[in-house]
Regions:
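A hydrophobic, multi-pass inner-membrane permease signature
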Residues: 1-181
Length: 181
């Protein structure tokens, strides 16, 4: 049953992302079920970022990385009297820190580079991400390529800084991903 859910998630990768925006919008507006932290996540940081952490690619990466943790570790922890939660907290999460950092970096980059999603849920210009701000700048000031390229260059600095500080864990997760244990 677990594999059926996983493969149906993988099948959803074939659906264009733009088509999934409408159901996401209905959820964020609070039309489908009540949300924590208020009736709607429109014009909020939660509405802008939370949908990117449920990305199917991120779920796929986490599953594949955690799946390669040897069963012998669970057997040894169970013999020591560890519960499922204790095993998750003390063994799985520390061993998975490289992939957790990697998927967090991917989620940040997805949210940072998003364009259509912020246009749908944000009305306040002070919440606009860089991509939408650059688009608004072009609409108001015209196409001045020197200013456009300067703004685009400035927009990549946070991603580069984040990658610089997480580079060791990022490369560790990539190098360990294909190894069979």
């Amino acid at each position: 049953f677990r594999d059926v859910i996983f493969y149906s998630l993988l099948l959803s990768l074939m659906i264009p992302e733009i088509i999934a925006l409408l159901p996401h919008l209905l959820i964020i507006r609070g039309n489908i079920f009540p949300l924590p932290f208020g009736p709607s996540w429109m014009n909020s940081l939660q509405g802008l970022t939370v949908p990117f952490f449920g990305n199917v690619f991120i779920i796929f990466l986490l599953r594949q990385y955690i799946k390669k943790i040897p069963n012998e570790l669970w057997d040894a922890a169970r013999m020591d009297g560890a519960s499922h939660f204790y095993f998750l907290r003390k063994v799985v999460i520390p061993m998975s820190m490289p992939i957790i950092v990697t998927v967090s970096l991917f989620a940040f980059i997805l949210a940072w580079n998003s364009f259509a999603w912020p246009l749908l849920i944000l009305t306040k210009e002070d919440w606009f991400p860089v991509t939408v701000s650059i688009y608004s700048f072009i609409r108001e000031a015209g196409t001045q390529y020197n200013l456009l390229m300067a703004a685009s260059l400035i927009s990549i600095f946070p991603v580069l800084l984040l990658y610089f500080f997480t580079q060791r864990l990022f490369l560790e997760s990539i190098s360990n991903f294909g190894l069979k244990q």
